[in-house]
Design a protein with these regions (language model features):
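Helix-to-loop junction immediately C-terminal to a conserved catalytic motif
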Residues: 51
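Conserved ABC transporter NBD signature motif
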Residues: 59-67, 75
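ABC transporter nucleotide-binding domain
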Residues: 174-263
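Conserved ABC ATPase "signature" region
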Residues: 99, 103-126
Length: 308
């Protein structure tokens, strides 16, 4: 089976700044890949190169069987790209927006195609509502409907649920997985850890470099991080003290508990020993979270930048 995305050594520069630095990415059809990283890490630029909107300064590969450099027009016809910001017309209704997009694609029987998209995304009852009056969640549903009108084989979604309430986010992700079940490949950037865990696989980028790739469980296991959790009176108040302890990569309070992690088991023991006089606090080993791993990876990326 031909990979939906198979690119190697992607590079993009703006002046002297390299914003995407030799990124390799391979994604099989029907998979949902979460694309994570801090703001300014190169996620949007990578998505735009993959869908043919930006020309790479280096690298090669194929997208949907088309050459990344010479087949950009063919890639655009088979891919759907959803931008971070709502890009449809707020003074048009939902139906008018979708019919406009369908006509741009030159779709035959476009009214039938629009009716199907309205039904699929639960927009039929709101079809005559102005897009500008929609809440964030409904705007994202409309944007997704516009992306799938032409029957794309690949969806590139750039932080599609930013600023959307939890219920709307869950509903949106249910639709993403329904599309993947039909064989559509989805590459979606997100900052939400719960969304990352719903992906078949994850790619983490920082400062333009791909730092980790695999399932959530694989990335956690490969990180080598160790974690401990403290409970008891005053545990949460130790976060500031232990966050600066040598070897500790993260110390975060969650309610009345404290979570610390490090790649060095001995550093964890020393950190715990340094507050052993707090008799009301109990410590136990824990499993690192994706958030722990990504904070650790971002620290590594910063260290690499400092060295270079």
């Amino acid at each position: 089976m031909t990979a939906a995305i198979d690119v190697q050594g992607l590079v993009k520069r703006y002046g002297t700044k390299t914003v995407v630095d030799h990124v390799d990415l391979k994604l099989e059809p029907g998979r949902v890949c979460g694309f994570l990283g801090p703001n300014g890490s190169g996620k949007t630029t990578t998505l735009r190169m993959i869908c043919g909107l930006l020309t790479p300064d280096g690298g090669s590969g194929t997208v949907l069987g088309q050459d990344l450099l010479t087949g950009r027009d063919a890639i655009k016809r088979q891919a759907g790209y959803m931008t971070q910001r709502f890009g449809l017309y707020e003074d048009l209704t939902i139906r008018e927006n979708l019919e406009f997009v369908a006509r741009l694609y030159g779709l035959p029987h476009f009214k039938d195609v629009v009716a199907e998209a309205l039904t699929r995304l639960g927009l039929t009852e709101r079809q005559n509502q102005l897009a500008g009056s929609l809440s964030g969640g409904w705007k994202q549903r409309l944007a997704l409907a516009a992306c799938v009108l032409h029957g794309p084989k690949l969806l590139l979604l750039d932080e599609p649920t930013a600023g959307v309430d939890p219920k709307a986010r869950r509903s949106f992700w249910d639709e993403i997985h329904a599309l993947a079940a039909q064989g559509i490949t989805v590459l979606v950037s997100t900052h939400y850890m719960d969304e990352a865990e719903r992906c078949h696989e994850i790619a983490y980028i920082a400062y333009g470099k791909l730092m980790a790739r695999g399932s959530a469980a694989d990335i956690i296991a490969q990180s080598g991080l160790k974690a401990m959790v403290a409970t008891g009176e005053g545990a949460d108040r130790l976060a500031q003290t232990l966050s600066s302890f040598p070897g500790i990569t993260a110390a975060a309070a969650f309610g009345t508990t404290l979570h610390i992690c490090s790649p060095d088991a001995q550093a964890l023991k020393r950190a715990v020993a340094s507050v052993s006089d707090r008799k009301s606090i109990r410590w136990q080993e824990a499993t690192p979270t994706l958030e722990d791993v990504f904070i650790h990876l971002m620290g590594q990326a910063q260290d690499n930048m400092a060295v270079s």
